[in-house]
Amino acid sequence: MKKAIALILALLLCFSLFISCGKKEEEAETQESDTETEASDECALELRKEIATSSYTVTGIGKSTDAELVIPDSYNDLPITKIDDKAFWGCSQITSVKIGKNVESIGANAFAECSALKRAELPDAVMKIGERAFFSCPSLESVTLGSKIRKIEASAFEKCKALKSVALPESLAALGNSAFFECESLESVTVGDKAIEMGISVFDKTAMLKAKDKWENGVLYLGKTLLKVDTEKTDELVIKDGTTLIAPFAAVDTKISALTIPSSVEKIGNSAFANSDGITAVTIPDSVKTIDASAFASCSALKTATLPDSVRSFGSHVFIHCTALTSANIPKALNEVPQHTFNGCSSLKSIELHPGIRTIGAYAFSRCAFTQVTLPDSVTTLETHAFHSNYSLISINIPKNVSKIGTYCFDHCYKLVDVKNASGISITVGGTENGHVGRFLKELNVPEGKLVKEGDFLFYTFEGVNYLMSYLGESASVTLPDSYKGEAYEMYRDTFSSSRTLTQITVPNGIKKIPTNAFKECKGLTEITLPNTVTTIDANAFNACTALVKVNFNGTKAEFDAIKINSTNSLFINAEIITN
């Protein structure tokens, strides 16, 4: 046992040797010059020797009582290359720090909450400033950054409320989330000739964003980066030529009426135009290589989006909840439709998937308005909820290479009656396995001639019964056909569910039942005309039809009162009922 303990102690000494520059054994060493002696006297800091790199890391304040802290270039002829995480966290004595020329990185929280720190001078060797490195240094007025710095991580200078200006070197490639967040006095930021990758809220709550004299027609640029758009800007946003980066959240919640992106732009950041509900169309130039997550999320008026094949990086949620979107495409360089890309795009009735798409991500097309989907043979994976709640979906193919259908992939696709299965996956009528793909089937591989488009209506025939499945037109006022091929038909469940165009409808004589969810969430429906042949109105047939005010019934009040109306149809019951 004693030998084991001794071995562990020996290993600890070899790989993590902590020393204090002022220790007696070090003072006993022969010094050959006054410079070395002075350096030794100054270096009361706590250090750790890095055996692998033959260098030292500063790990703490040690015995130092200096207000003007100087971190030496080296110790014991080995360079000091790093300041460790939390090394000087909360050291209230420090008023300034000058960091030695060999230090390459400053760790997380290294100088966080140093309340008296006014000046920080970093050498050219520093390439990275860690998360919260100077977080909440309220007295910090001046920071000198070296010429080789590559990255300033999240919240590095957050809440440095006295900092008025900062020069970001040409070498800087990335600023993390909230890097200068709540630097209330920061009014001047200079940058080099290239755009800097930016996280979220980098300069939020700074004086720079409030100084409107630096804005150009409601737009603030930082070098080649579009940093911010005034939320009150209502005219067209024409991004100036030469801009290469649109920063995260740059135009979030704006009222801009149109958008023009120049061919110099290479990247559109996270949520850049999210919730900008005045944009109706967007054309992305072929200079753009990256579109980050949620870039156009919840742009409720956006109808068309044209994406170039130059896009190679495409985030999740890009068009989520763009409820007016009717046309979009997938760039050919992508082999995946990322998760939630078109989730909630309730006007999107079709999309072309290029050969090369392998994966349909989770919720990628959930709550769209597809009637038919054709998947290319390249598709191998349908992730969870990929087509969930496509109430209009009637027909889809499962290509030969598909090996996975995720859970609930087709759940709530109540009208999915036609599945052409070329894969090795087993699909059963009424089955809930493999993403519920077979749950609402009446038969496998519907034969030709049983699913027929007649005019603007789609019909399906099964066991001698004709069903009206869906309306494929765009008219706001619709009259259903009297018959199908001269024969009677029934309305299938969810016939018009979630229609965004329907305002008036006339149901012909002979229809006996208004089925479940027939007009569910038809929020524009104001008036309906029903025949006296209707005897049943099923559950949620008029659920969320909030605009419905008038029901014309071609029969007597007694006939209307005899209809079996499910109690979930209160909006129908409370409308004005007009009888003969």
Predicted features and spans:
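Sec-dependent signal peptide recognition
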Residues: 2-10
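C-terminal motif of bacterial Sec signal peptides marking the signal peptidase cleavage site
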Residues: 17-20
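Bacterial signal peptide processing site
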Residues: 22-24
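Post-signal peptide N-terminal segment of mature Sec-exported envelope proteins
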Residues: 28-48
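Structural signature of tandem-repeat unit edges
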Residues: 42-53, 64-82, 92-105, 115-128, ...
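Consensus positions within tandem repeat domains that build extended binding/scaffold surfaces
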Residues: 85-87, 107-110, 130-133, 153-156, ...
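Lipid-handling modules and contact-site tethers
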Residues: 224
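A structural signal for leucine-rich repeat
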Residues: 563-568
